[in-house]
């Protein structure tokens, strides 16, 4: 089995959502934060890929201290906010069938290792 293009597209979508979720938890501590990422991607009705990656969440400093909602200045809005994500390492990648049996597969390692995505807010 060769992993289809939709696998790589879905992986990019999952990585973007992962990076965006950091905004829900507040500011980041620096402009680069290393994290572990994992997800399951359905390839077809009977095959699922399980992915574990080491990623770097990229952030940029924002000084949007003016609260437009309340019309006041608030230092709570200063800080590093996610701006992108890049893949550092492939820790685990496996494909299983509907019986949870491992399935041999081929994939483009460079296509995963070279992922660098920018968030568009």
What are these regions (language model features)?
Residues 1-6, 94-121:
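Mixed-charge, Lys/Arg-enriched low-complexity segments
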Residues 1-46, 109-112:
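Low-complexity, Ser/Thr/Pro-rich intrinsically disordered segments found in N-terminal tails, propeptides
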Residues 3, 11, 15, 28, ...:
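Generic detector of leucine side chains in alpha-helical contexts
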Residues 28-109:
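Acidic, low-complexity, intrinsically disordered interaction modules
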């Amino acid at each position: 089995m060769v992993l289809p293009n939709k696998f790589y597209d879905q992986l990019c979508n999952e990585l973007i959502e992962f990076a965006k979720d950091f905004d829900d938890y507040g500011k980041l501590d620096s402009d680069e934060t290393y994290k572990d990422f994992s997800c399951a991607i359905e390839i077809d009705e009977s095959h699922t890929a399980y992915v574990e990656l080491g990623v770097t969440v990229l952030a940029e400093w924002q000084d949007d201290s003016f609260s437009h909602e309340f019309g006041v200045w608030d230092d709570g809005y200063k800080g590093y906010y996610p701006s992108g994500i890049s893949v550092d390492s492939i820790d685990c990648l496996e494909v299983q069938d509907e019986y949870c049996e491992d399935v041999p597969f081929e994939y483009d390692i460079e296509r995963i290792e070279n992922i660098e995505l920018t968030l568009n807010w």
